[in-house]
Amino acid sequence: FTMSITLNGQLLLCLLAEGLMHIEGLRLIQVNTDGLTVRVPRQNKWLVDLARAGWQSRTGLNLEEAIYKTMMIRDVNNYIAQYEDGNVKRKGAYEYDMDWHQNAGGLVIAKVAEKVLTEDAPIRETLHNWPDIMDFMLRTKVPRSSHLAIERDGVTSQLQNITRYYIAEGGGRLFKWMPPLAKNPGQWRKIGVESGWGVHPCNDIKDAGKLPVDFDYYIREVEKLCLGLA
């Protein structure tokens, strides 16, 4: 039953999208499982309303409407949109108001990306002046069968299985040590975390700032969310 309702709803959205594509100047931005987004000249907005009303009458379903001032989209599941009243909608990689069960690592990346996209803020300067070191924190974890270790200056130190860290200049290399696979029963697997970057463990917040933040990493991550968007 659930599958039939889901498929039927998606097919009906496709029907709506097909009808909207006949409107002059309209551009279909995205179609998701529960809605769609279009860009249309203001003078043709009434045609969208007409198509919407006809679709609702035909299907017996109701459509909610939201009008954006601007929308920056990486893909259908990752985008940021600003309403006409200034409020912001965030999805996927652009979210930073996390629930307790979600990974709240690297919040500075999404927060700075939003400022870049909605306020035209400079990436490097905004990151360098960011006031909260906690927003730079990342985290990784491994199951009990594995362990985390950091290598620095020829010394290897084991870390707790859930470890908080930030990308730091002069930091060590972080690795996951995973149990052997059946085809190589005697060989533990060494998997890099943030390969190519130094990290500084920070399970105790007093350790924050002992090594300088490597801003180049965070600049690169912000650029991934800001450059080349539709």
Question: What positions do the PLM features span?
Answer:
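Conserved pre-motif C helix in the palm subdomain of viral-like polymerases
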Residues: 1-17
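Acidic/histidine-rich catalytic cores and adjacent linkers
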Residues: 4, 21, 42
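Generic non-transmembrane alpha-helical segments
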Residues: 15-24, 50-58
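C-terminal, non-catalytic extensions of nucleic-acid polymerases
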Residues: 45-230
